[in-house]
């Protein structure tokens, strides 16, 4: 058994008590647990690997261990990485609510308050900027791996796991991994992708926080692409240099020409839009087709939408991507 140290404390599985199963994530079963040394609650993720017989690739263990260095108030802390009998357990700090569950608690008539929408989006961008500056891409961001607490903080979970372990097509329960937040370059088979994939996901989540409805609800890769095209128009080389060279681009794609994005935010009942001009301008920057032109997390933190945000109570304060000497 190997345990990888955090704060010089060598943890083994015996240091944690499993309390109850709380879900099945992309990578396996998640349990609520207790750290026997500190009595703190933890989330224990038992990673299911495709090749159970061979055990855990050492590259995955090394890669995941590096994630313990990602210490930021808006990133769910990885407290220990434990290998036992060819099983890999990741021990994270425990938060009881994810963004999806939180939004599901809002009544039919109720929307996320505009200050909360702004605060959550800013905090997500702060975490993303911190990780991107350290060359860590999330690649599988969705409301289910954004965790919230009662103090108004939001934290990103599962950072870097996509690269370390790979994203399975189906979850543990054979439920298909959601495509609703996946960037068009990934959907069209790009072999190399950049931090822009996360910015696209943030755009989709930002829109969903405003309307309570997923923006692009596809049930297959091609359905997902066509739903994007129907709202934003089918991309051409003109707005996305290199799109026609992507492996899964087809010249026969239907040519939707109009952009209907703004219509998605019109609330018939009140006659108002669910996003103001600044918010919509940020969203447009996040949903630019060409990943090279899509807004970066650092630029997004300086967008006029956030000019009036009160950062005094935020976990990471007014951090807007300034590099800190560590």
Swiss-Prot record:
MF term (GO), any: RNA polymerase II CTD heptapeptide repeat kinase activity
UniProt note on regulation of activity: Phosphorylation both activates and inactivates the enzyme depending on the site of phosphorylation.
Positions with a binding annotation for ATP: 22-30, 45
Cross-referenced SMART domains: S_TKc
Record keyword Amino-acid biosynthesis present: no
Swiss-Prot/TrEMBL keywords: ATP-binding, Cell cycle, Cell division, Cytoplasm, Cytoskeleton, Kinase, Mitosis, Nucleotide-binding, Nucleus, Phosphoprotein, Serine/threonine-protein kinase, Transferase
Residues in coiled coil: none
Keyword Transferase in annotation: yes
Record-linked Pfam families: Pkinase
GO biological process, one term: cell division
Location in the cell: Nucleus; Cytoplasm, Cytoskeleton, Microtubule organizing center, Centrosome
One GO location term (cellular component): cytoplasm
Domain Protein kinase: 16-306
Active site as annotated: 140 (proton acceptor)
InterPro entries from the UniProt entry: CDK, Kinase-like_dom_sf, Prot_kinase_dom, Protein_kinase_ATP_BS, Ser/Thr_kinase_AS
Catalytic activity: L-seryl-[protein] + ATP = O-phospho-L-seryl-[protein] + ADP + H(+); L-threonyl-[protein] + ATP = O-phospho-L-threonyl-[protein] + ADP + H(+); [DNA-directed RNA polymerase] + ATP = phospho-[DNA-directed RNA polymerase] + ADP + H(+)
EC code: 2.7.11.22, 2.7.11.23
Family the UniProt entry places it in: Belongs to the protein kinase superfamily. CMGC Ser/Thr protein kinase family. CDC2/CDKX subfamily.
Function according to Swiss-Prot or TrEMBL: Plays a key role in the control of the eukaryotic cell cycle. Required for entry into S-phase and mitosis. Acts as a component of the kinase complex that phosphorylates the repetitive C-terminus of RNA polymerase II. May function in concert with npp-16 to arrest prophase blastomeres in response to anoxia.
PANTHER family from the UniProt entry: CELL DIVISION PROTEIN KINASE, CYCLIN-DEPENDENT KINASE 1
Summary of subunit composition and partner proteins: Forms a stable but non-covalent complex with a regulatory subunit and with a cyclin. Interacts with cks-1.
Name used for this protein in its record: Cyclin-dependent kinase 1
Organism name: Caenorhabditis briggsae
Gene: cdk-1
